[in-house]
């Protein structure tokens, strides 16, 4: 049964008197650090020199190289990209950990797949907001929050659960509610959602729809509007009220087409393919492929990225967005 924790459920402030090092100052890093600081906690930033280092200083934080930040901290939250966490941990974090430190993550990838293997005498926990950093920060300032997940991998001190819940409350997450999970469950469901639906599934669905219309002789501009541009309208309705809200809001023609044609596109074979994707996540095939490609300079990754950048739908989209000044352009030029 799903367990959800709110402000009133966090009885003990296990962060009181502890120093927190937030490693990284990107999307999640700036939000966690600022929310914790606003709640009165002692926060330092660990990061390499660069724009984020300078930005953290401008925001009023004490900023140190990662190793120095870890040395002085009791709780270390690692908020770096998955592909660099392993090296940073090995070279800068692990040598400076002390007994009963707490090592924390917002995504379980490197712990679950064994890239990072903490010593047995430190706590390891997860606090994962289900939204981007800018939303975590904005909702906090507004007095609300983004729902989050939390989980415990190691409880060396006997206080890991209290520390994790206190951390979740510290970033404001318990205002909305935090759901208890495990590193395994968070990692595998997150990767599956990205690959089968949110990123991989949706992008290929849109591309295939665009190609079908263009190959049938329709103008690429109209195809773009029908299968990509208008997606936002549907997703916004879905975000606010689920599929029922979509079907309530669209025309009867569109709703009828949903029922009779959706199953022709997403056939039982698609679900079987989704199961295969999930299996590759569960058995480590995907993580091994990603990790090995990273070691080889991301040759496969960059090749695939370049192929997608050149798709006709991207060229048409860039041109059409120039006609819509109400859209804040986020075109990625190379």
UniProtKB/Swiss-Prot annotation:
UniProt cross-references to PROSITE patterns, sorted A to Z: KARI_C, KARI_N
Stretches of the chain forming a coiled coil according to its record: none
Keyword Chaperone appears in the UniProt entry: no
Keywords: Amino-acid biosynthesis, Branched-chain amino acid biosynthesis, Magnesium, Metal-binding, NADP, Oxidoreductase
KARI N-terminal Rossmann domain mapped to chain residues: 1-181
Xref: InterPro entries: 6-PGluconate_DH-like_C_sf (IPR008927), KARI (IPR013023), KARI_C (IPR000506), KARI_N (IPR013116), KARI_prok (IPR014359), NAD(P)-bd_dom_sf (IPR036291)
Enzyme Commission identifier(s): 1.1.1.86
Binding site for substrate: 251
MF (Gene Ontology): ketol-acid reductoisomerase activity; magnesium ion binding; NADP binding
Binding positions (Mg(2+) 1): 190, 194
Pfam families linked to this entry: KARI_C, KARI_N
Family the UniProt entry places it in: Belongs to the ketol-acid reductoisomerase family.
The protein, known as: Ketol-acid reductoisomerase (NADP(+))
Organism: Staphylococcus aureus (strain JH9)
Gene: ilvC
């Amino acid at each position: 049964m799903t367990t959800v924790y709110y402000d009133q459920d966090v009885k003990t402030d296990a962060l009181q008197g502890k120093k927190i090092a937030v490693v990284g100052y990107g999307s999640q890093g700036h939000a966690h650090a600022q929310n914790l600081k606003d709640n009165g906690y002692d926060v330092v930033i660990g990061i390499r020199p660069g724009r984020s280092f300078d930005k953290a200083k401008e925001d009023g934080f004490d900023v140190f190289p990662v190793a120095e930040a870890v040395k002085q901290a009791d709780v270390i939250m690692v908020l770096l990209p998955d592909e660099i966490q392993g090296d940073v941990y090995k070279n800068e974090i692990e040598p400076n950990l002390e007994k009963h430190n707490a090592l924390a993550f917002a995504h379980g990838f490197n712990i679950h797949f064994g890239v990072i293997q903490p010593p047995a005498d430190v706590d390891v926990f997860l606090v994962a907001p289900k939204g981007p950093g800018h939303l975590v920060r904005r909702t906090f300032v507004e007095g609300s929050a983004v729902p989050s997940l939390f989980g415990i991998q190691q409880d060396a001190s006997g206080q890991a659960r209290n520390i994790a819940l206190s951390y979740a409350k510290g970033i404001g997450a318990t205002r909305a509610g935090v759901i208890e999970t495990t590193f395994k469950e968070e990692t595998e469901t997150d990767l599956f959602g990205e690959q089968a639906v949110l990123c991989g599934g949706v992008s290929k669905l849109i591309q295939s729809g665009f190609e079908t219309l263009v190959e049938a002789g329709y103008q690429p501009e109209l195809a773009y509007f029908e299968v990509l541009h208008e997606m936002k309208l549907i997703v916004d309705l879905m975000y606010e009220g689920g599929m029922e809200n979509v079907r309530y809001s669209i025309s009867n023609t569109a709703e009828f087409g949903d029922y009779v044609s959706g199953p022709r596109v997403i056939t039982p074979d698609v679900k079987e393919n989704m199961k295969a994707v999930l299996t590759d996540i569960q058995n480590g095939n995907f993580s091994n492929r990603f990790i090995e490609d990273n070691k080889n300079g991301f040759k496969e990754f960059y090749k695939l990225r370049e192929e997608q950048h050149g798709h006709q739908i991207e060229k048409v989209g860039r041109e059409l967005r120039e006609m819509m000044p109400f859209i804040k352009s986020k075109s990625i030029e190379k």
